[in-house]
Design a protein with these regions (language model features):
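Internal signal-anchor transmembrane helix that establishes type II topology
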Residues: 1-6
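Hydrophobic alpha-helical transmembrane segments in integral membrane proteins
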Residues: 13-16
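Aromatic-rich surface patch/π-platform used for binding flat ligands and interfaces
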Residues: 18-142
């Protein structure tokens, strides 16, 4: 009889009920749209052996920026939705900051993979600037 209940639930016209989607899941997917192992490999393959060490340093920094973004974005999401330690206004401000950082990361990743070679020195400087900014997107008062 319990099997019958399971079958009847699965065969409902509206389908089986699904658990609510976790609002704090899948931030990695956003990053992987523009910074993944294959994109990193493409950056490392550009240019000659001489610049390989510099490109390797740049890609390692992009890895760190991306990992920090996912970790901090997930943490802030959980602060709001799970732990309730920040209100909607604080959450919205932090999300806007994370979106801005993500746009900067996307721009840098696009420049790193662009044909015609971008100015690696300028890109290194922009990446260092992004690394220097607080990854948490917290205001000084927090």
């Amino acid at each position: 009889s319990s099997l019958l209940v399971l079958v009847s639930l699965a065969c409902r016209p509206d389908g089986p009920t699904k658990p609510p989607k976790d609002p704090c899941a899948d931030f990695e997917v956003e990053i992987e749209r523009f910074w993944s192992a294959s994109i990193k490999a493409k950056v490392l393959d550009r240019g000659g052996e001489v610049a390989l060490a510099r490109r390797s340093g740049v890609t390692n920094k992009m890895d760190r920026i991306s990992e920090d973004w996912v970790r901090m974005r997930t943490s802030v999401c959980k602060d709001h939705f799970v732990r309730g330690t920040i209100d909607q206004q604080q959450y919205a401000a932090r999300v806007q900051c994370f979106d801005d950082r993500l746009d900067r990361q996307r721009t840098l990743a696009t420049a790193l993979t662009a044909d015609g070679g971008s100015d690696l020195t300028a890109l290194e400087s922009a990446i260092d600037e992004l690394l220097a900014a607080p990854a948490s997107c917290a205001s000084p008062a927090e």
